[in-house]
Amino acid sequence: MREFDPQVLLEKARQAREQAYAPYSNYRVGAALLGRSGRIYTGCNVENAVYPLTTCAERTAVVKAVSEGEREFVAIAVVTENGGTPCGACRQMLREFGEDLVILIGDTEGRYRETTLRQLLPDSFSAADVRR
């Protein structure tokens, strides 16, 4: 039996997307991260005139969760206008907490697809590589 309802996570991500601050790209992203505890942490992208300082929705959700004590995650839903996937930096940050994370990639029309972090970031770098 599945531990979560994909539609609940996708809806939370859609709602988070509405809070995005994207005056430069107009590319609004929302994320909803499900912790092992059952809590959902949301995030949106926050752009900056100095582009490298922009914070992605996925990383916002992770930082919120970790700052509240959550360290284990089940799934994340990411919603964009066109169903774009998480960027490389977000994939790597999510990888820090495990590679079996379910990733739901949705768009504003309600379509989504399901994948895993292992599929999006094969042969990834992890804490085990640092300890060698």
Kindly label every feature range from the protein language model:
Residues 13, 31-32, 61, 65:
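Small-residue (primarily alanine) positions within well-ordered alpha-helices
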